[in-house]
Amino acid sequence: MKQLTSAQVRQMWLDFWKSKDHAIEPSANLVPVNDPTLLWINSGVATLKKYFDGSVIPENPRITNAQKAIRTNDIENVGKTARHHTMFEMLGNFSVGDYFRDDAIKWGFELLTSPEWFDLPKDKLYMTYYPDDKDSYNRWIECGVDPSHLIPIEDNFWEIGAGPSGPDTEIFFDRGEDFDPDHIGVRLLAEDIENDRYIEIWNIVLSQFNADPAVPRSEYKELPHKNIDTGAGLERLVAVMQGAKTNFETDLFMPIIREIEKLSGKTYDQDGDNMSFKVIADHIRSLSFAIGDGALPGNEGRGYVLRRLLRRAVMHGRRLGINEPFLYKLVPTVGKIMESYYPEVLEKQDFIEKIVKREEETFARTIDAGSNMLDQLLADLKAADKDTLEGKDIFRLYDTYGFPVELTEELAEDAGFKIDHQGFQAAMKEQQERARANVVKGGSMGMQNETLSNITEKSTFNYEKEALDSSLSVIIADNKRIEAVSEGQVLLVFSETPFYAEMGGQVADHGLIKNDKGDTVARVTDVQKAPNGQALHTVDVLGSLSVGTTYHLEIDHERRNRVMKNHTATHLLHAALHNVIGNHATQAGSLNEVEFLRFDFTHFEAVTPEELRQIEEEVNQQIWKAIPVTTIETDLDTAKEMGAMALFGEKYGKNVRVVSIGDYSVELCGGTHLKNTSEIGIFKIVKEEGIGSGTRRILAVTSKEAFEAYRQEEDILKEIATTLKAPQMNQVANKVASLQDQLHKLQKENAELKEKAAAVAAGDIFKDVKEVNGLRYIASQVEVADAGALRTFADKWKQKDYSDVLVLVASIGKKVNVLVASKSKDIHAGNLIKALAPIVSGRGGGKPDMAMAGGSDASAIKDLIAAVAENL
């Protein structure tokens, strides 16, 4: 067996499949593009769905890749097991309607066992297969596999909802009896017992059926094109090749672990408890790659995942004695390890470090708040003479403050308390169920559309013409090809078309189709790309259409022109964003419509009004310079040498289209554009907002719509000026400032009057002192405008020795507000309010001397006041 580095293993995989005529598909971004069913790219096949469902036909039906992926469903196992990771690489080879079972198994065995390639010992390999899949069993036997190494497993059938499915055969590497202390042997595989002896290194999915959840598996229809979909975990394969005890002892992780040793002063012991080292090493890989691919920490979606990973890593750093920001210092090491295939981490190192460090610094403040909460919880337990920290509180520490359960348990035990593991798991399960309920349903590859996939007639798009004559090649109605049509809605393919198919964020052209007499026979309402690249025109039929006949196609010129204004302006906006807020502001989505443009980009905070002003001004400067817009077609390498910006998540072929706006903007783009920036007229930003963690959106308008937006603002300003009786609009600001000054004076006077009134009221309330069990208390309902007035009462109460305890209740709007203050060491205000608040259907808490609660049942206020004595 060869000793190979991780880079060599990855490259050997790609080289082998390239030798079998596979095209190497570059690794896609971790953030999915145009796939709402996925939070992350989570497998090697995730980016190839379009090929397997037939919506796009690949240039080469044989594909191989090394794809970075993120999965966080087993985050709690990371660091505990030898092979769980949040970020990993999946090596794959794929056949889209080309070779099938025979070649997949034969070539797979060759790659693993040939001395030219991985050279793994044949007697160390075991395979599982679906019991009904006798063909796979026979292929393995033909390869020379011992029958005792072939294990039938009922679960070896791959399907996720509707779409491609089929049996799979998994390959395992036997690491020997050192990893099988109970000497169970192959039964570990046959009975699916969790173990470290038999390591799954590869899964070959034989996709031959269109799964239909409505029928039994035996009734699944055969796919028109059978596929191969495989996945081999790089980390596991490297661990096998390097003879490592766990994945973490390979060259993918050990350099990171060595850096953690330097930062912590602790030593990694392969045979000891190294969970914190492993968690940090794993999580910083995920953070580095995800942030580099445009995701940013936040409170929802993938941003929440990153924040959780970072906080978990920070807490494990603290367990190692690292109490200052340190994760950002590991980013260069991650970049160097992966540089040979993933240079993007080092290329974006400064930005990634900045985001990680900033998030660490923010979390440092949160940790203090969480520590204070834990201290309070433990103090409350002690006061209540309880010995167990409740599961819901452990979960709140975990979910809100990022405290790992192990750390909470350790701190609680140090203080003499146990923790409620069962309650924590119940709270965790509730959250997971809520998360699953919020996930967009989907994820299967979709049913193959054979009719569209089988369109082979050539069709070209003519950028230069807005009208032309062209022969009708294909008519599709109700998913069937027909020769003629005279009514309804159908799909058409022409040999040549001036109609732009929706793509790259630009909406499709609309227009008319006419016969040789000039009569309109169809209205084009949409244009989309067919699997083989043809333009599919969706039309409302108004006359007679027949295959083989030539028709006159003309687009809606005004619509196209308005869309082009917005598309060219989008390129200017993208460049301006880079210049004003930084190169990290990469495109995360765009829409070039008729009436507006929408641009999504990665950024970690709201764009300030001043920055928006600069961006808007810079775009308009480029418009007024009347810069020519040029387009050329060239190969991808030449385009990169020109400095062309490749858009986020896009895949490009060998030949690309480069759109240049002078030297201000150079982008790869297949859309339609103006000839000169001056044609845009004017550009105006109408809105900037956050649409998700780390993603901002700008909505803007151009030309006529921009003029109308400015006119609308002017009309509003005139109306305000009239209301304020300002003769000139430039006097509006001064008038508003004057009104604000008057308002502040009135508010101050009002506050002073309230304070005087409160003092008078307090004098009456503080006279009503009662006593129980030797404690003097005041309990009263008061009439106040807001909860702040309750605190004012409490402040006055503290100034003199009126009583030991104060309880005030106020009904404000639809809410009941309760305040408890205590001067007695025997009465904890926070505990007392927890007992009283439920009476008014509320909840609350606080410190020993002051606590507040909110409720909703005003009818129970008298009951709450009466209950004060019972709880003292």
UniProtKB/Swiss-Prot annotation:
It comes from the Bacteria. Keywords: Aminoacyl-tRNA synthetase, ATP-binding, Cytoplasm, Ligase, Metal-binding, Nucleotide-binding, Protein biosynthesis, RNA-binding, tRNA-binding, Zinc. Signal peptide: none annotated. GO terms for molecular function: alanine-tRNA ligase activity; aminoacyl-tRNA deacylase activity; ATP binding; catalytic activity, acting on a protein; transferase activity; tRNA binding; zinc ion binding. Transmembrane segments: none annotated. Its EC number is 6.1.1.7. Its cofactor is Zn(2+). It is found in: Cytoplasm. It catalyses: tRNA(Ala) + L-alanine + ATP = L-alanyl-tRNA(Ala) + AMP + diphosphate. Pfam families: DHHA1, tRNA-synt_2c, tRNA_SAD. GO terms for biological process: alanyl-tRNA aminoacylation. Binds 1 zinc ion per subunit. InterPro entries: aa-tRNA-synth_II/BPL/LPL (IPR045864), Ala-tRNA-lgiase_IIc (IPR002318), Ala-tRNA-ligase_IIc_anticod-bd (IPR018162), Ala-tRNA-synth_IIc_core (IPR018165), Ala-tRNA-synth_IIc_N (IPR018164), Ala-tRNA_ligase (IPR050058), Ala_tRNA_ligase_euk/bac (IPR023033), DHHA1_dom (IPR003156). Its main location: cytoplasm. Consists of three domains; the N-terminal catalytic domain, the editing domain and the C-terminal C-Ala domain. The editing domain removes incorrectly charged amino acids, while the C-Ala domain, along with tRNA(Ala), serves as a bridge to cooperatively bring together the editing and aminoacylation centers thus stimulating deacylation of misacylated tRNAs. This is Alanine--tRNA ligase. It comes from Streptococcus mutans serotype c (strain ATCC 700610 / UA159). The gene is alaS.
